[in-house]
């Protein structure tokens, strides 16, 4: 049995006569060789490496083809597939955005090998019904992939003919989705989970071997580790490292600990790597799709061995933990910190819940080489946090940011999500003001557009997606679901791709782009005035943190435009001038915050926003036809308000959990018919993740 595991890239496709081609098929895009410059670095196919390790532990041998990072054209795919001649292919789609390429690759495989088994895994299998019916896929794996994939191989060994399925045998394997003998979707529940003791770290040598054999070079393995000198944060990182080292040296004088001095210049020549210390997430955010259930941590001994390997083999001096939910296990978090210090590497951690740590924890982590921590906050409005089911308060976030600032830990509240059901002008103002308060606390300037905000996108397998279907915003037929996935793949997180789930008009929602920034900057200015009794201090801070920062931001935006003009604008001077004038006018309106009251400036901003929206609508809206699945989509007037998140519905909720979008979706579901058929029950498993 020849087994091939492939990482599948996200990205849209251009449809041509006779075949599906990747976007930009005329260009060679390769994350390793950088034949087209990219600000991104390759991401190791961790899921694929995990599955192949478990396969080998159970007596199977397989090959890896890193399609995600190599980005081959169809001709290269065909050449490699013919070289390997697989009998079983596993396609790993970690995002719903991978759907077009899942379809493309499966089609090529079926054309080449009519009898090949095609198995799809990853978060994308929340759309299993669509994948099984609209692509050449035979089976989907729902949940953790290791155990069910090996059981599929066991099944194929006994039943090699893919056209003659033993439905009874397949039904005994947990974690599968397939089309049964009655042409109905069958989901056998979520898969068995590997126990924590069996979690393994990726074998980069296996990936290196794959790159050497299939479309790349073995030395490209080093591209997974970014040189720190290329990081925009290198100076800040070195400053924190110096602080940590000085503290350790002072402690050494008292406790006689053996402390190794850190050479800052040496650190600049190190590389940054990634490591997982846990698997899964304890949270249930209503916008987030999580196919992996439960929460497990890696063994401390295995972590230490892996960290030392990365340090010695790949010159890694700075590690980023890539956990979905770091520090949820307090005991394990302390073990991780001790290992990092023992191994002599500095580290950062993102995806931390603000309620998972306190001041003493942060202090301990800082003493054990933690440089940076990222908290996911999503909104500065308590109403929106409750709808997202974040289960913390914005005061919790503020307190953690304050403690990090006091301890000298670089921290970044992760990107804001705007436009969820229940979002209003008031909640957007709250978010802008909250971002301003955190930036003021951290002695930063007033650019509250950082961290960047993204518009909420409904991903299959989330309450947000089901809510959109309940309200007629996303269709329920296979063709409509496929059209939606193709659309969000093309536009991703842009405003144009956003489906308005709020009570406000599209024009009003577009204005929120500006409202968040302007309300935040007004709040920032007010904080300066309230915190400084001296007029001189007020003027100095307003100049340094507002006016000067705005000028620098304008210059930086111009620099970016001119660097990209040959690629994006193709020398069209008029278009460049229009964009420059637009940037200049927005910056001038920002400066107006320093001199004009809200009652005067905000109506001007709204009028400007409405004018911008008019031209955007005129440019993008399809004439003599209907736009679907974007901001211009005509909403279904036949859907009653009983399914929608309205302010009155939120106000009537007595408990936080009643404001959760999950609760609202469950109530909506009960108002319709309960699942009757086995297929409807299977679809509900995928929709609810249970």
Positions of the model-derived regions?
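A structural motif corresponding to the C-terminal end of an alpha-helix
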Residues: 51-63, 313-314, 403-411, 438-446
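Structural recognition of alpha->loop->beta junctions
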Residues: 131-150, 367-375, 434-453
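Glycine-rich beta-alpha loop elements in corrinoid/cobalamin-binding modules
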Residues: 47, 54, 61-196, 200-203, ...
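Radical SAM enzyme core and accessory elements
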Residues: 3-5, 12-22, 81-87, 157, ...
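Radical SAM [4Fe-4S] cluster-binding motif and immediate context
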Residues: 43, 205-413, 418-420, 429-433
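A short, flexible N-terminal coil/short beta segment enriched in small residues
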Residues: 1-46
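Short hydrophobic segments within beta-strands
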Residues: 6-8, 65, 92, 121, ...
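Flexible glycine/acidic-rich beta-alpha junction loops that bind and position SAM and/or redox cofactors
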Residues: 13-14, 127-130, 283, 383, ...
């Amino acid at each position: 049995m020849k087994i091939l595991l492939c990482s599948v890239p996200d990205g849209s496709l251009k449809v041509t006569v006779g075949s599906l081609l990747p976007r930009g098929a005329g260009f060679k895009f390769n994350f390793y060789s950088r034949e087209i410059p990219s600000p991104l670095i390759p991401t190791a196919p961790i899921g694929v490496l995990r599955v192949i390790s478990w396969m080998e532990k159970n007596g199977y041998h397989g090959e890896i083809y890193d399609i995600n990072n190599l980005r081959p054209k169809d001709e290269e795919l065909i050449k490699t597939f013919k070289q390997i001649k697989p009998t079983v292919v596993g396609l790993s789609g970690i995002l719903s955005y991978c759907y077009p390429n899942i379809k493309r690759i499966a089609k090529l495989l079926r054309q080449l090998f009519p009898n090949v088994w095609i198995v799809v895994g990853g978060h994308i299998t929340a759309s299993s019904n669509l994948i099984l019916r609209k692509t050449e896929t035979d089976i989907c794996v729902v949940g953790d992939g290791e155990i069910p994939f090996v059981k599929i191989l066991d099944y194929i060994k006994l039943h090699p003919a893919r056209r003659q399925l033993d439905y009874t045998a397949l039904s005994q394997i947990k974690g599968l989705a397939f089309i049964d003998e009655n042409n109905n979707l069958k989901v056998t529940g979520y898969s068995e989970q590997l126990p924590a003791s069996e979690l393994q770290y990726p074998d980069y040598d296996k990936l290196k071997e794959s790159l050497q054999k299939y479309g790349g070079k073995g030395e490209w393995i080093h591209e997974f580790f970014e040189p720190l000198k290329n990081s925009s944060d290198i100076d800040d990182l070195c400053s924190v490292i110096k602080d940590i080292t000085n503290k350790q040296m002072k402690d050494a004088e008292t406790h006689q600990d053996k402390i190794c001095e850190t050479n800052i210049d040496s650190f600049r020549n190190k590389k940054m790597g990634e490591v997982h210390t846990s698997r899964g997430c304890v949270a249930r955010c209503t916008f987030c799709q999580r196919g992996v259930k439960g929460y497990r941590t890696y063994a401390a001994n295995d972590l230490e061995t892996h960290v030392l390997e990365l340090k010695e083999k790949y010159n890694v001096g700075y590690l980023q933990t890539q956990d979905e939910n770091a520090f949820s296990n307090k005991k394990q978090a302390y073990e991780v910190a001790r290992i990092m210090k023992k191994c002599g590497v500095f580290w950062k951690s993102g995806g931390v819940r603000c309620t998972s740590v306190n001041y003493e924890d942060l202090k301990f982590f800082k003493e054990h080489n933690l440089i940076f921590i990222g908290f996911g906050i999503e909104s500065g409005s308590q109403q929106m946090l409750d709808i997202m089911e974040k289960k913390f308060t914005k005061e919790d976030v503020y307190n953690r940011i304050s403690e990090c600032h006091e301890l000298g830990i670089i921290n970044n509240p992760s990107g804001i999500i705007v436009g969820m059901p229940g979002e209003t002008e008031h909640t957007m103002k709250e978010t802008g003001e909250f971002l301003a308060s955190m930036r003021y606390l951290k002695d930063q300037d007033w650019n509250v557009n950082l961290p960047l905000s993204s518009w909420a996108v409904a991903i299959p397998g989330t309450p947000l997606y089901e809510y959109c279907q309940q309200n007629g915003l996303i269709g329920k037929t296979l063709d409509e679901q496929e059209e939606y996935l193709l659309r969000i793949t093309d536009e991703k997180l842009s405003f144009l791709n956003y489906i308005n789930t709020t009570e406000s008009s599209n024009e009003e929602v577009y204005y929120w782009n500006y409202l968040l920034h302007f309300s935040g900057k007004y709040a920032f200015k007010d904080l300066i005035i309230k915190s400084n009794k001296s007029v001189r201090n007020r003027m100095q801070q307003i100049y340094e943190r507002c006016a000067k920062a705005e000028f620098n931001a304008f210059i930086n935006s111009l620099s970016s435009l001119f660097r990209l003009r040959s690629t994006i604008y193709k020398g069209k001077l008029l278009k460049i001038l229009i964009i420059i004038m637009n940037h200049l006018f927005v910056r001038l309106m920002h400066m107006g915050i320093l001199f004009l009251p809200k009652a005067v400036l905000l109506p001007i901003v709204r009028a400007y926003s409405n004018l911008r929206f008019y031209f955007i609508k005129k440019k993008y809206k399809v004439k003599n036809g209907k736009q679907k699945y974007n901001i211009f989509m005509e909403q279904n007037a036949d859907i009653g308000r009983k399914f929608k998140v309205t302010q009155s519905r939120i106000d009537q909720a007595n408990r936080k959990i009643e404001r959760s979008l999950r609760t609202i979706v469950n109530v909506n579901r009960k108002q319709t018919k309960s699942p009757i058929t086995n297929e409807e029950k299977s679809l509900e498993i995928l929709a609810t993740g249970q």
